[in-house]
Amino acid sequence: MARDISDLTPIEGAQTLIDYIAAGSKPKERWRLGTEHEKFPFYTDGNMPVPYDGPRGIKALLEGMQMMLGWEPILDAGNIIGLVEPTGAGAISLEPGGQFELSGAPLETIHQTCREANAHLAQLREIAEPLGIKFLGIGGSPKWTLAETPRMPKTRYGIMSSYMPKVGTRGLDMMYRTCTI
């Protein structure tokens, strides 16, 4: 989940950049790992992507996860677009094409991140399977065209969708048809 920060201080040379980076460093005992795990939801009856609305849509999936986990909803223009763990130990968000993303808690070891991702997937399955939804953890959409890919109701994605075609030919595919793992 993006947590955008703006700093308009100009970089005036190599030392300014070095100092800026060094100011953000932490002692080794405070180093942490954070998982970003995206996956494509799809319907098992027809292998099509899952739209936002409807009784078996992304919104229903997020609402089910909210009830199960007790996490706080993230809203955009009244639409639930994610969940955040109340103490800041992780979040679930939506990417532009409905890619479901776990933004994990800051953890000490790769083994902890593995357990966190596995627990997330088990929780997700518990809500998704009754809806006829499964997930693909794969870098690119295997079969759905851009036109077949649903659009999530997140304000900034509308802005980005208008901008991307002006700066390249594959920006919309990157937004809607890719996942990170």
Stretches with model-predicted labels:
Residues 1-169, 177:
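Terminal catalytic/cofactor-binding subdomain
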